[in-house]
Amino acid sequence: MATIVVKQIGSPIRRPEIQRKTLIGLGLNKMHRTRELEDTPSVRGMINKIPHLVEIVEERG
């Protein structure tokens, strides 16, 4: 299956609780950390909820 590399570019400080939980759901918790995730509709939806906090670095597959 295809994967995407996601990088956290924004801080969760002073953000709504739902945005912080979305970051945790993606496996991110500190600035400039990256995660390689499966490219599924649920992951894409989570990324689309917080585009100001994360960026897609690379799409593989």
From Swiss-Prot:
Family, per entry: Belongs to the universal ribosomal protein uL30 family.
Subunit structure: Part of the 50S ribosomal subunit.
Organism superkingdom: Bacteria
Pfam family, one: Ribosomal_L30
Gene Ontology molecular-function annotations: structural constituent of ribosome
PANTHER family for the chain: LARGE RIBOSOMAL SUBUNIT PROTEIN UL30M (PTHR15892:SF2), MITOCHONDRIAL RIBOSOMAL PROTEIN L30 (PTHR15892)
Protein name: Large ribosomal subunit protein uL30
